[in-house]
């Protein structure tokens, strides 16, 4: 037969469990503006019952918090990473397309630009066909041909500068990717050290998700998380250092 304090113990377990739930809710409110924070939930479970009455069977002993887990959906994470990768790709593409368009764009005031120079070149060529004996016409055509050569030289220089800037940006992006990958590798080890013992590394998982968010804005991202076990069913863990990317 349970002691006289049995009911008090049940009440105490309820107070302790719901205090944890309240603390978890307070933590959610406190981090409502924290970038990358994932809402957490205290999971409750009935404690092991005891058998005290032969006729009625077991009786409950209270409640306990079994874990505090994240309310996060991997499906939406993957969709976001895919969309963020596409957005980053097209933003960079648009940036360089705008630069190239600026180089080829005509200046209406100075009448300089790809279309203007070529149009004037062919006009002078047509005039030269009909008035080739006129020295001024010949000089005008020569001058326009020189302007075309000067324009092409300037165009080549500008495109080369864009290419060099692109190469430097690629190098910086590769370095950034390697840096993020190294941080993710460190977090993976820390998460494993906690969760292999049955814990939940919620805050560390948030940090890792933030890094993947950042990484997805630079390159395509695909993540896989799985447990490795040996033939006896024991959990194994291997976390090799990330492979550095190199610009080819």
Task: Annotate the PLM regions.
Residues 189-209:
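Periplasmic/extracytosolic POTRA-like scaffold domains at the N-termini of outer-membrane
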Residues 145-195:
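Long, non-coiled-coil amphipathic alpha-helical linker/lever segments
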Residues 177-178, 213-216:
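Intrinsically disordered, charged and Pro/Gly-enriched terminal/linker segments
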């Amino acid at each position: 037969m349970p002691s006289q304090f049995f009911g008090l113990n049940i009440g105490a377990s309820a107070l302790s469990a719901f205090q944890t739930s309240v603390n978890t809710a307070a933590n959610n409110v406190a981090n409502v503006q924290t970038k990358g924070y994932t809402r957490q939930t205290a999971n409750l479970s009935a404690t092991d019952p005891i058998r005290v009455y032969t006729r009625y069977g077991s009786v409950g002993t209270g409640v306990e918090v079994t874990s505090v887990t994240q309310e996060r959906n991997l499906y939406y994470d993957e969709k976001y990473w895919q969309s963020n990768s596409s957005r980053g790709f097209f933003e960079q593409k648009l940036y360089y397309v705008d630069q190239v368009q600026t180089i080829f764009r005509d200046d209406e005031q100075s009448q300089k630009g790809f279309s203007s120079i070529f149009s004037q070149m062919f006009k002078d060529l047509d005039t030269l066909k009909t008035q080739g004996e006129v020295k001024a016409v010949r000089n005008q055509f020569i001058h326009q041909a020189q302007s075309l050569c000067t324009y092409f030289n300037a165009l080549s220089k500008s495109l080369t500068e864009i290419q060099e800037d692109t190469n430097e940006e690629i190098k910086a992006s590769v370095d950034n990717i390697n840096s993020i990958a190294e941080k993710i590798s460190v977090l993976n080890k820390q998460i494993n050290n906690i969760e292999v013992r049955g814990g939940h590394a919620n805050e560390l998982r948030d940090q890792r998700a933030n890094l993947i968010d950042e990484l997805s804005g630079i390159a395509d991202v695909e993540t896989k998380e799985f447990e490795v076990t040996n033939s006896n069913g024991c959990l194994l863990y291997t976390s090799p250092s990330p492979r550095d990317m190199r610009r080819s």
